[in-house]
Amino acid sequence: MVLIKAALIGIFAYPGDTILKWSIKDFGPFYLPSRGDTIVMDDKHYLLYRNLIEWEQQDKLIASNGHFYLNGREVEHYVFMHNYYFMGGDNCYNSQDSRYWGPLPEEYIVGKATLIWKSKNRVTDEICMDRIFKKIK
């Protein structure tokens, strides 16, 4: 997995999205929020950030006729409370990563990849024994 921190990254409208029409390979642009970042609530931001806001607030973010409600109150802006990371797999077409499940809150990161655990030859589908347990540079 690759960790990418706080940059303009195309993610999180899930492959197959019919509104933004992003694909698995052509995502974005999407701003990866950090603690203290503020967004204006609109239809696009609702689509992109709803899951993060609901996770932070532990409540549903409701959209109704161009207005947005959280905890029973209308919201025009939202200030993020956490830092988020994009987790990207090394195989664009066959990775279940942040393009599917969204940005990962910083507090959920518990380690750092340091070794290659498994490596397969893309042509023969055989394990590349010479790469297993090599350090990641």
Give each language-model segment a name.
Residues 1-137:
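Extended hydrophobic leader/signal-anchor segments used for secretion and membrane insertion
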